[in-house]
C-alpha cells in the first residue's frame, strides 16, 4: 500500500464519517464477516508467545503447523485478507465503522510483521520453543479443575512437538545468534522439567492417560534436546544482526500500533517521563523519612488472604471515588500458589490466567511464589503490598479491561490488536489510583508505584534503541539493572523479550501519555460537563482500541489519525 494511497484512504474515511455524523451505529455486516473469518484463521495460525494479553483460545484438537508448505500458504492468506479488506465498500460509514476498518487493517498488517518483517519462523530459534513448551504452558495456566478434554488437548500438544521442531530446523535459514541464546536458556534441563510437569499432573488426570502422557513426554524431550543440540552446533554460523531497523520500526508504529510518533519523538517522551518519575520518587522518599520500611508477608497464604481483601477494597474505592463503573457481573482477580505441574515451565511466560471471552463467569488468577526479599522485581513488590500488581494486572487493569472488552457488543472490538492501549491502560491506572489516595494507608507503597514509573520510562529507551541497533541485549539488560534499579534476572528477561518484540516495551509509557492527552483535550472541549468516569467506562469497554482511534471516536479529533500516515521527515 503506497504512502499516498494510505493518506487518501484515511482522509476518505474521515470525510465519510463526518458526513454521516454518527459515532455508534449498527455494526457493518461486511466488516463483521471479514472479522469473523480473519480471527477464526488467526486462532489457528497466531503464534504462542510469553505475553499474557494476546493469548487466544484454540479450536479443539489444535496444534501449530509451521511446515514450509504451510508458511507459504500463511503468507498468501495475508495477501488475500489484505486485498479483501481494501475492497470493502466504504459508502455511508459511521465513525465506528471507520474505526473498525482501521482496527482490522492493523490486525492484518500484524501478520505481515510476524511473517515478512520479523520473519519469526526463519530467524528466531526461540519461536519454536514457544510453539512447543509455550503451548503446553498456556494449557497448564488454566486454573479451573482439570477436565478430560483439557488433558486430551495437552496430550495432543505433547505429541505435536517433534514435528514442530523438525519443521523449525528446516525453516531457520537465517537464524539470529542472540535469539538462539534465548532458546537455549529456555530449554535448560528440559527433560526433567517435562517429567516433573507430567508426574505432578497424575493426581488430576485420569489413570488411563498416564502412560500416553509419559510416552509423549519422552518423545517431546528427545526432540527438544535434539533441537537444542542442533542450535548449539549451528550458532557459530548464525547472524549477529537482530535489530529491525528504523524503516520497519516506523512501519510498525504507523500501520500496526497506530502510534503517531517517530522514534526520536518516542525517545524524547520517554526521557521527559524519566525525569518526572525520578523526581517524584525522590519527593516520595523525602516525604516518607522516618516511616517504617514495608515488611514482607510471612507466607503465601497470608499474602493470598490480604490480596483478596485488597482486590475487593479496590473495587469499592473505584465506585466510592466515582472513578469508573465496576460491572456487577465482573468476577474477581485472585492470587494462588503456583501449581506443581506449572512450576517447571513457569519461566515460559507471565504466570496468570486472565480467563477469556468464553470464560467470563470465572475468576482470574495470578500465581505467586513464597514471599521474601530475594524474589524478582515484580514479585518482590507484591510480597510487600499486593495492590500495585493487582491494579496493573487485575482491577482495574488487564483483567478488568479485557473482561469488559470481551463483553463489547461489537465483536470486532473484543480482539487484541496491539499492546499500546492495553498496557497503556494498565500503567495509567497505577498512577490514577495513587493520585486518588489509595495508598495513603501504606505510604511506602507509593515508592513502588514511582519505581514502576521509572521502569516504564526506561523501557521506551530500551525498545527504540534495541530496534534501531543502538543496544545489544546484554547492554540493554545492564542499563535496566543499574538504572531502574532492578535484579539482573528480571532485567535480562525484559531485554530479551523486548529484543524479540519491537514496539512492545514502548506501549506502557506511550499508551499512558496518549490517554492523558485525550483526557486533557476532553476536559478542554467539554469543560465542566466532562465526566472522567464516563471516559473511563468508554476506555475500558473499548480498551483494545489504540488510543489514537479512541481520540477520534470520542472527540472527533483527527490530528493523530492523519499523522499516522504522514511521511516522517
Which residues are covered by each model-predicted region?
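N-terminal secretory signal peptides that target proteins for export/translocation
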Residues: 1-7
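Intrinsic low-complexity/disordered segments
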Residues: 3, 23-24
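Alpha-helical and His/Cys-centered functional microenvironments
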Residues: 7-10, 402
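Bacterial N-terminal signal peptides
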Residues: 10-21
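N-terminal maturation segment of proteins
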Residues: 26-569
Amino acid at each position: 500500500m503506497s504512502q499516498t494511497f494510505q493518506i487518501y484512504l484515511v482522509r476518505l474515511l474521515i470525510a465519510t464519517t463526518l458526513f454521516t455524523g454518527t459515532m455508534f451505529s449498527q455494526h457493518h455486516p461486511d466488516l463483521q464477516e471479514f472479522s469473523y473469518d480473519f480471527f477464526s484463521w488467526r486462532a489457528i495460525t497466531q503464534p504462542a508467545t510469553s505475553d499474557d494479553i494476546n493469548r487466544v483460545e484454540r479450536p479443539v484438537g489444535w496444534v501449530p503447523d509451521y511446515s514450509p508448505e504451510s508458511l507459504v500458504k500463511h503468507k498468501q492468506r495475508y495477501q488475500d485478507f489484505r486485498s479483501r479488506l481494501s475492497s470493502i465498500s466504504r459508502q455511508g460509514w459511521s465513525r465506528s465503522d471507520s474505526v473498525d476498518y482501521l482496527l482490522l487493517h492493523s490486525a492484518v498488517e500484524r501478520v505481515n510483521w510476524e511473517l515478512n518483517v520479523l520473519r519469526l519462523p526463519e530467524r528466531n530459534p526461540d519461536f519454536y520453543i514457544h510453539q512447543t513448551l509455550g503451548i503446553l504452558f498456556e494449557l497448564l495456566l488454566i486454573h479451573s479443575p482439570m477436565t478430560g478434554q483439557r488433558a486430551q488437548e495437552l496430550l495432543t500438544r505433547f505429541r505435536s512437538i517433534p514435528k514442530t521442531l523438525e519443521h523449525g530446523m528446516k525453516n531457520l535459514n537465517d537464524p539470529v545468534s542472540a535469539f538462539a541464546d534465548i532458546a537455549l536458556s529456555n530449554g535448560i534441563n528440559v527433560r526433567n522439567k517435562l517429567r516433573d510437569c507430567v508426574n505432578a499432573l497424575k493426581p488430576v488426570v485420569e489413570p488411563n492417560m498416564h502412560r500416553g502422557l509419559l510416552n509423549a513426554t519422552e518423545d517431546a524431550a528427545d526432540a527438544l534436546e535434539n533441537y537444542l543440540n542442533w542450535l548449539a552446533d549451528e550458532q557459530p554460523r548464525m547472524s549477529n544482526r537482530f535489530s529491525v531497523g528504523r524503516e520497519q520500526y516506523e512501519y510498525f508504529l504507523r500501520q500496526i500500533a497506530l502510534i503517531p510518533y517517530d522514534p526520536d519523538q518516542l525517545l524524547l517522551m520517554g526521557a521527559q517521563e524519566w525525569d518526572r518519575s525520578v523526581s517524584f520518587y525522590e519527593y516520595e522518599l523525602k516525604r516518607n523519612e522516618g516511616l517504617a520500611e514495608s515488611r514482607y508477608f510471612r507466607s503465601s497464604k497470608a499474602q493470598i488472604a490480604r490480596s483478596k481483601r485488597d482486590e475487593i477494597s479496590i473495587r469499592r474505592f473505584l465506585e466510592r471515588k466515582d472513578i469508573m463503573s465496576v460491572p456487577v457481573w465482573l468476577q474477581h482477580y485472585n492470587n494462588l500458589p503456583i501449581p506443581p505441574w506449572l512450576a517447571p515451565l513457569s519461566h515460559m511466560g507471565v504466570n496468570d490466567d486472565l480467563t477469556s471471552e468464553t470464560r467470563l463467569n470465572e475468576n482470574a488468577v495470578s500465581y505467586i511464589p513464597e514471599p521474601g526479599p530475594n524474589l524478582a522485581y515484580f514479585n518482590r513488590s507484591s510480597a510487600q503490598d499486593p495492590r500495585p500488581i493487582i491494579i496493573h494486572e487485575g482491577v482495574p487493569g488487564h483483567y478488568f479491561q479485557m473482561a469488559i472488552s470481551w463483553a463489547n457488543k461489537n465483536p470486532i472490538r473484543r480482539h487484541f490488536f496491539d499492546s499500546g492501549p492495553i498496557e497503556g491502560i494498565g500503567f495509567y491506572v497505577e498512577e490514577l489510583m495513587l493520585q486518588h489516595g489509595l495508598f495513603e494507608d501504606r505510604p511506602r507503597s507509593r515508592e513502588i508505584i514511582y519505581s514502576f514509573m521509572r521502569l516504564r520510562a526506561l523501557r521506551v529507551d530500551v525498545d527504540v534503541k534495541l530496534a534501531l541497533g543502538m543496544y545489544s541485549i546484554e547492554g540493554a539488560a545492564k542499563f535496566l539493572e543499574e538504572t531502574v534499579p532492578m535484579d539482573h534476572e528480571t532485567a535480562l528477561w525484559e531485554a530479551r523479550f523486548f529484543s524479540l518484540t519491537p514496539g512492545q516495551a514502548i506501549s506502557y509509557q506511550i499508551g499512558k501519555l496518549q490517554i492523558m492527552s485525550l483526557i486533557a483535550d476532553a476536559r478542554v472541549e467539554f469543560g465542566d460537563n466532562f465526566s472522567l468516569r464516563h471516559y473511563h467506562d468508554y476506555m475500558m469497554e473499548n480498551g483494545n482500541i489504540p488510543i489514537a482511534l479512541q481520540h477520534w471516536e470520542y472527540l472527533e479529533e483527527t490530528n493523530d489519525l492523519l499523522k499516522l500516515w504522514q511521511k516522517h521527515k
